Amino acid sequence: MAAPRPPPGRLSGVMMPAPIQDLEALRALTALFKEQRNRDTAPRTIFQRVLDILKKSSHAVELACRDPSQVEHLASSLQLITECFRCLRNACIECSVNQNSIRNLGTIGVAVDLILLFRELRVEQDSLLTAFRCGLQFLGNIASRNEDSQSVVWMHAFPELFLSCLNHPDRKIVAYSSMILFTSLNSERMKELEENLNIAIDVVEAHQKQPESEWPFLIITDHFLKSPELVKAMYAKMSNQERVTLLDLMIAKIVGDEPLTKDDAPVFLSHAELIASTFVDQCKIVLKLTSEQHTDDEEALATIRLLDVLCEKTANTDLLGYLQVFPGLLERVIDLLRLIHVAGNDSTNIFSACASIKADGDVSSVAEGFKSHLIRLIGNLCYKNKDNQDKVNELDGIPLILDSCGLDDSNPFLTQWVVYAIRNLTEDNSQNQDLIAKMEEQGLADASLLKKMGFEVEKRGDKLILKSTSDTPQL
């Protein structure tokens, strides 16, 4: 006569399979832990049993890493590992008691070691990929809103796990490892990233490849951009494509729906120093684009994005004052505008005033946008700043700006920023107003163009007066 089966264990009134010895028992636990009441009443002994199964099954993975011929025998072990991770993952959802119990058993270290073994196997098996993903989900859940677990995850996972997973070909593995990194990061751990820049750059690359994934985006905007030291170190080591991605996210943060906070302002001032100094040093690289061989030069395109960032930063009142007095910035912008203007006049190239507007009205050439933004930046830097207004005059920038619009007045984007710049240059500045009035009289400024821009010249006795018309500028 067969021995009677032991009665099933109970989880505070919920029937539980016991002992947990096989796949069906683990699957039953996984299903039970989908409900909060079962998670809240789970005994610690359950998690010890799951850990024992996980450790036993991991031995097969270790063997396969040493002997590749053993990979084909992994199927049953991978099934058990996957279900262990699913069970633990579900148990941790909104349950700090379970998070603490599982952590205190040493499960996090076992899980991280196993995940690193998965990466070593380098074989394409759906079952391996599923176990890999579930392991990362477990680490994300045990660390969620639990600082003690975050510390243990960081201790075991940094930097090897992130170096192994953030550049993985599987999109879900990249997303889940990004979730773990986002959850675990704090100000102290950010300093460790400065010594492991490859991880930070891998996050930027992950966002570049998966812009729809929220975790890499949040890591960059909520953590990286709050650390000027990290951004500076990253920028120096990045490829130009990665720089463009980072600068795009910086723009998104500045122009986003939520205004910069008081804490953000000093940080973005530090970014402004990096962006402005880099632009001043490297902006002439853009002239490479005048050559047909360099029309897609990544370094030049990254420099164009620096200008886009400067335009948005100078549109922010908290950042404008710093950049208005930044050494050499205004002079370099005017100098570059002149060089581009001459290049566009001398030959047919990417800076020439031809065929730059698409049928839908968008500027089709990044170079045309660059010229517009140079003029926009001059206008921003001269906003209510007499010193900069006078400096533009001294550098013969006013005729240059007017001539830029005259050559290609079919471009509404360029015309818009010329109007804006001229208004800022002439506001409360009689010297600049007189200059434009005299240019009109001498035929150096087109009266019809000035009228389109909302200005007209009036003669009062021996004086020429530049005044605004009541008409809206015709853009």
Curated annotation (Swiss-Prot):
Tagged with keyword Phosphoprotein: yes
Processing after translation: Polyubiquitinated.
The entry's keywords: Cell cycle, Cell division, Cell projection, Cytoplasm, Cytoskeleton, Methylation, Phosphoprotein, Ubl conjugation
Pfam families found in the cross-reference section: Atx10homo_assoc
Modified residues (Phosphothreonine): T82
Gene Ontology terms describing biological process: cell division; neuron projection development; regulation of cytokinesis
Subcellular location: Cytoplasm, Perinuclear region; Cytoplasm, Cytoskeleton, Cilium basal body; Cytoplasm, Cytoskeleton, Microtubule organizing center, Centrosome, Centriole; Midbody
SUPFAM superfamilies the UniProt entry points to: ARM repeat
GO terms under cellular component: centriole; ciliary basal body; cytoplasm; cytosol; midbody; perinuclear region of cytoplasm
Residues the record lists as Phosphoserine modifications: S12, S77, S430
Omega-N-methylarginine modifications at: R10
Functional summary from the UniProt entry: May play a role in the regulation of cytokinesis. May play a role in signaling by stimulating protein glycosylation. Induces neuritogenesis by activating the Ras-MAP kinase pathway and is necessary for the survival of cerebellar neurons. Does not appear to play a major role in ciliogenesis.
Family the entry assigns: Belongs to the ataxin-10 family.
Subunit-structure text: Homooligomer. Interacts with GNB2. Interacts with IQCB1. Interacts with OGT.
Protein name in UniProt: Ataxin-10
Species of provenance: Bos taurus
